[in-house]
């Protein structure tokens, strides 16, 4: 599988503000991971639509997806789901056990991420669609990981549980 683009999601109002100021996506402090990071989803957009809109905000909060070349973004950490949702226990699978985030961390190379997609999804298309596959040539450790990840496929969870999250410590400029 070839590397897919990285996608950063933001609201339209945040995008307009950034474009008027610096045209640079700057690392922001993450309380959960206690570091300044820029977050991306690997290969597909993933965001939650605000269902608690108590007024007409127009298009201010419409999602904007920025695409980045993976060769130009240094990976700090990679996880097979949205870490914020996991740590805030929005991902319902975490009710089955007190798993630490570290147990799910992927090696931070694009080669490893492509291997992960081949192992658990079979292809980039299946990954994009969120369709897991079960390969018969996986190791015991991979089977355990697959079972843990399979819990994340609960219908109670949204698309962020099937999307690889990548963080970087470096700013990303826009053309």
Label the model's feature ranges.
Residues 1-38, 46-175:
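Active-site-proximal loop/hinge segments that shape catalytic or ion-binding/gating pockets
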Residues 43:
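Short, conserved catalytic/metal-binding motifs centered on acidic residues
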């Amino acid at each position: 599988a070839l590397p897919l683009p990285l996608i950063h999601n933001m609201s339209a109002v945040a995008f307009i503000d950034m474009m008027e100021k610096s045209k640079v996506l700057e690392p922001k402090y993450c309380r959960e991971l206690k570091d300044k990071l820029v977050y991306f989803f690997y290969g597909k957009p993933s965001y939650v639509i605000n269902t608690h809109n108590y007024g007409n905000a127009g298009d201010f909060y419409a999602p904007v997806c920025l695409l980045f070349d993976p060769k130009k973004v240094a990976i700090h950490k990679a996880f097979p789901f949205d870490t914020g949702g996991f740590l805030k226990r929005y991902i319902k699978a975490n009710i089955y056990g007190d798993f630490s985030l570290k147990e799910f961390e992927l090696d931070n190379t694009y080669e490893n991420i492509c291997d992960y997609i081949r192992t658990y999804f079979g292809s980039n298309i299946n990954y994009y669609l969120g369709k897991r596959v079960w390969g018969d040539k996986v190791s015991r450790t991979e089977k355990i990981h697959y079972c843990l990840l399979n819990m994340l496929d609960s219908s109670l969870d949204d698309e962020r549980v099937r999307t690889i999250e990548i963080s970087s410590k470096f700013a990303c400029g826009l053309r």
